[in-house]
């Protein structure tokens, strides 16, 4: 945690005072809050941005998120007849793609803890004609409401950093995977090139909130986005967390020089 704080203050020229967390507290961006409050605070962020979430994804990533997602699908091994959990699936980009891959004999469940995001995703997919093999569930990643050994693939995309207890969530994902199934975690991570880190930090803390203010009239939600990325575990730390949760053959791919990383692990 100290290293992350030093990295943020040195590169971004901010001075957040990070208090150590306890069993009752966690981080909401750079703030230390009660665990019982974080879920509500994250919910408010996504209630605010749900309506223009897809537009902001395109604007903030310059459309590159589509390339990251295509690579993730290529690594998924999903095929006809599979059952897929798109966790923290939001507006359903992955659900739409996986629906076609699994076909009528398979199933995709779009799950999100936030009802606003789930509502936007359901409407979007129905307008695209994605029906028949897709179901929707409001669910907390830390306590998934599915039986053991249910899914061939679980994916969580740009959602794990918002989870209060990441270790508990990873164990929950492991439980619902079938033996032989795989977990894919696509998430913002730590750039591996120092010059890129400096540019990325400037963009994240100076430009990104201003775009949020102009497009959705909400700069604070996008300031939280930047802070939550800095507080998310680095690539090797998340890899070890997945191993500790029971996953095997865990590896990761740095995308866009580590701005995003895709972690993959198997349940055997």
Swiss-Prot record:
InterPro entries: SAM-dependent_MTases_sf, UbiE/COQ5_MeTrFase, UbiE/COQ5_MeTrFase_CS. Pathway: Quinol/quinone metabolism; menaquinone biosynthesis; menaquinol from 1,4-dihydroxy-2-naphthoate: step 2/2; Cofactor biosynthesis; ubiquinone biosynthesis. SUPFAM superfamilies: S-adenosyl-L-methionine-dependent methyltransferases. Residues 1-23 are annotated as: Disordered. S-adenosyl-L-methionine binds at residues 91, 112, 140-141, 157. One of its GO terms (molecular function) is 2-methoxy-6-polyprenyl-1,4-benzoquinol methyltransferase activity. Pfam families: Ubie_methyltran. Its EC number is 2.1.1.163, 2.1.1.201. It is an enzyme of class 2 (transferase). The keyword Transcription regulation does not apply. Keywords: Menaquinone biosynthesis, Methyltransferase, S-adenosyl-L-methionine, Transferase, Ubiquinone biosynthesis. GO terms for biological process: aerobic respiration; menaquinone biosynthetic process; methylation. CDD domains: AdoMet_MTases. It comes from the Bacteria. Disulfide bonds: none annotated. It catalyses: a 2-demethylmenaquinol + S-adenosyl-L-methionine = a menaquinol + S-adenosyl-L-homocysteine + H(+); a 2-methoxy-6-(all-trans-polyprenyl)benzene-1,4-diol + S-adenosyl-L-methionine = a 5-methoxy-2-methyl-3-(all-trans-polyprenyl)benzene-1,4-diol + S-adenosyl-L-homocysteine + H(+). Residues 10-23 have a biased composition (Polar residues). The keyword Cell membrane does not apply. Methyltransferase required for the conversion of demethylmenaquinol (DMKH2) to menaquinol (MKH2) and the conversion of 2-polyprenyl-6-methoxy-1,4-benzoquinol (DDMQH2) to 2-polyprenyl-3-methyl-6-methoxy-1,4-benzoquinol (DMQH2). PANTHER family: 2-METHOXY-6-POLYPRENYL-1,4-BENZOQUINOL METHYLASE, MITOCHONDRIAL, METHYLTRANSFERASE. Belongs to the class I-like SAM-binding methyltransferase superfamily. MenG/UbiE family. This is Ubiquinone/menaquinone biosynthesis C-methyltransferase UbiE. It comes from Pasteurella multocida (strain Pm70). The lineage of its organism: Bacteria, Pseudomonadati, Pseudomonadota, Gammaproteobacteria, Pasteurellales.
